[in-house]
Amino acid sequence: MFRQAKWDEPLIFELSRPGRVGYTLPKPIEDIKVDIPEKLRRKSKLELPELSEPEIVKHYTRLSEMNYGVDSGIYPLGSCTMKYNPKINEEIATHPKVAYIHPYQDERTVQGALAIMWELEQWLKEITGMDRFTLQPAAGANGEFTGVMIIRAYHLDNGEPQRNEMLVPDSAHGTNPASAAMAGFKVIEIPSNENGTIDLEALENAVSERTAGLMLTNPNTLGIFEDEIVEIAKIIHKAGGLLYYDGANLNGILGKIRPGDMGFDIVHLNLHKTFSTPHGGGGPGAGPVGVKEFLKDYLPVPLVSYDEKSGRYYLDYNVPKSIGKVKELYGNFAVLVRALTYLKIMGRDGLREVSEIAVLNANYLTQKLKGTRGYSLPGKELRKHEVVFSAEPMKKETGVKALDVAKRLLDFGMHAPTIYFPLIVHEALMIEPTETVSKEELDAYVEALKRISEEAYTNPEIVKSAPHNTAVKRVDDVLAAKKPIVTWRMYKELKEKGEVDY
């Protein structure tokens, strides 16, 4: 049984002691006098923690022992593709010639960086069947917003301002309707049928002269391939709308079929999912957006282009109908470097194998867990890269909810799946093992879920009160949202006022 380390670890500011140092700045080779305007000078002392290097290393090592990541074990968050991040990615991304260049440098001095961005775009075009990409968006949701803004600009440019409705399936990621709403669209929800795919009759009834487009994930969030995608594309295009591809689940079809060949006009990708760049910590991520030829003039500026005559790469601002910038500078460059490293190492055959093993792992887990008491399997049985089980039978029969199952999994030293999503599945357990998980890990995960099922029906309280073996027990799920304390200064002020007691 798993037992997590537990340290009573203070904040790094609380460990600080005046005069302790972990780094000594080199002496300047000459006196540097900088005339800083008075209004820009600090009025108070810069409050930074003072610790020695050993103290810092021990502090963060202890914190890491109370954490869990993709390097710790299976991390099957559905629709997140938490695959292993190869360490060669980090080696390349932290190379001085990558890490120490500056975005304000003359483009003649960063030809290598521009070449990396240009080459990554060629890979993404080939993988998706798109004709042009922007690498600027910082994450999936930022990419979505970019895509729907392009849709909006396209319709306005064509004299169709009445196209203000964005169609979104009921199984969609929550960011889809949010991005559409931010771009000024009215969101129309399209229901799923009994197979877990889009209801074509409902889709046909929903389209009109007001339809701007349809945002679709394929495979969808149930892990089911939308096998009527060609007909879906025809319906949308006949109505004058555009088809938008949410690339969150590209890992399930990588190297097998391309969104552009299915009829999609715009795609966004999540490099931090499909192409092994790190998740978490608030970023950095990357959400490149690709478009078909007829939409390329709406992409954000600048693009990276190549001049064959001079043999140079350059930042191309000649994008006549551009929606403008969606992020400062040129995107999260180090993330782009990691993704290209992964692509070049894997190659075409390797990428195809990625999706094959991801699909195999998801279906292996599905078949091993299927039929276990308390878990039901909605929709089609054959899945792509992920599967959604429902713990609704368990809840009705024992009172043990999906949340309880997720918390109990932590006691086995395993990360919980995504829960309560998609919303169309009650008590959802959304499991995406990815291709980097071994058969032994899959077997252990299924056995843990079966063990939890047994406990739910024989000793439900042990599940309802879980986790028992982690450093932190059940947290207050809403406290951080209601009372965010995101800086040391905020925490110190609240503590001095007696408003926090920890």
Swiss-Prot record:
GO terms under cellular component: cytosol; glycine cleavage complex
Q: Which reaction does it catalyse?
A: N(6)-[(R)-lipoyl]-L-lysyl-[glycine-cleavage complex H protein] + glycine + H(+) = N(6)-[(R)-S(8)-aminomethyldihydrolipoyl]-L-lysyl-[glycine-cleavage complex H protein] + CO2
Which InterPro entries does the entry mention?
GcvPB, GDC-P_C, GDC-P_N, GDC_P, PyrdxlP-dep_Trfase, PyrdxlP-dep_Trfase_major, PyrdxlP-dep_Trfase_small
Which BP terms does GO give this entry? glycine decarboxylation via glycine cleavage system
- One MF term from GO for this chain? glycine binding
Q: Which domain of life is it from?
A: Archaea
Supply the alphabetized keyword list. Oxidoreductase, Pyridoxal phosphate
Q: Which cofactor does it need?
A: pyridoxal 5'-phosphate
Q: What is its EC number?
A: 1.4.4.2
Which CDD domains would you find in this protein's record?
GDC-P (cd00613)
UniProt modified residues of type N6-(pyridoxal phosphate)lysine: 273
Q: What does this protein do?
A: The glycine cleavage system catalyzes the degradation of glycine. The P protein binds the alpha-amino group of glycine through its pyridoxal phosphate cofactor; CO(2) is released and the remaining methylamine moiety is then transferred to the lipoamide cofactor of the H protein.
* Family in the record: Belongs to the GcvP family. C-terminal subunit subfamily.
Spell out the subunit comment: The glycine cleavage system is composed of four proteins: P, T, L and H. In this organism, the P 'protein' is a heterodimer of two subunits.
Q: Which PANTHER family match?
A: GLYCINE DEHYDROGENASE (DECARBOXYLATING), MITOCHONDRIAL (PTHR11773:SF1), GLYCINE DEHYDROGENASE, DECARBOXYLATING (PTHR11773)
Q: Kindly give the HAMAP family that the UniProt entry links to this protein.
A: GcvPB
Q: This protein is called what?
A: Probable glycine dehydrogenase (decarboxylating) subunit 2
